[in-house]
From Swiss-Prot:
Record-given protein name: 4-hydroxy-tetrahydrodipicolinate synthase
Swiss-Prot/TrEMBL catalytic activity: L-aspartate 4-semialdehyde + pyruvate = (2S,4S)-4-hydroxy-2,3,4,5-tetrahydrodipicolinate + H2O + H(+)
Pathway participation: Amino-acid biosynthesis; L-lysine biosynthesis via DAP pathway; (S)-tetrahydrodipicolinate from L-aspartate: step 3/4
Natural source organism: Parasynechococcus marenigrum (strain WH8102)
A Gene Ontology BP annotation from the UniProt entry: lysine biosynthetic process via diaminopimelate
Amino acid sequence: MTSPAALSPTPFGRVVTAMVTPFDDSGAVDLPLAGRLARHLVEQGSDGLVVSGTTGESPTLSWQEQLQLLQAVREAVGSDAQVLAGTGSNCTAEAVEATRQAAAAGADGALVVVPYYNKPPQDGLAAHFRAIAEAAPELPLMLYNIPGRTGCSMAPETVAQLMDCPNVVSFKAASGTTEEVTALRLACSSKLAIYSGDDGLTLPMISVGAVGVVSVASHVVGPQIRAMIDAYMQGDAAVALALHEQLQPVFKALFATTNPIPVKAALQLNGWSVGDPRPPLSPLPDDMRSTLAQTMAALRQT
């Protein structure tokens, strides 16, 4: 008889929200609103928050703004949630310094994206992440693979080379396939906690060994995502499947164009004045905003 597969730990909980960065009318980062939004997300079921990730518009934030955001969110949620700082860069020295600063500022972890644009080979990726891990050994790291944005994919075998770094504890899988989860588990065993990086694939990924999700949609449907994951983990696959299917229209609407354009519009529709994205991103077009509003209204009726 086959023994049950070992399940991975959950270093950052089950639902981690990749937070938007609020801007005021002048385009400056709205730190007080970031703190209020962070508290709201925790109250809606988030175990953890990522600041200054993809959804947080890290490419158009200065390092100083990113550090200020981290400090504001850390202060707002206290010990009620894990706070991860986006510290990735396509320059190893920059990523090392940002990760050190995040650790000193009280982050519970760092989300470190695969270097973008310069397309390093696999040995370069291994050296890059090892340097970051060794620079802040006290800070747990979540490696982040999103080849659709970076133009470079980190192979499971490369991740396995880093399993001797005690603080390489988790991986955000955003390649768009469940096969990545299986390949990572086979290469790294259950030691590595894998998080879905795609809201629509959360349930399929959990079914093959992921532990949770780094979510965009949890800004507006956090309780439902929490309920879906909890139902599956408690053995009620039918309830989890029903929630998965119920949420698909929202997931589709939130990714109808480049993230975080739609989710910022969704928050605005819910009364959160988070501002529009910074250029070169643009506001959500009126037709997409109308579709998004209709989708959210329909979900509230279910």
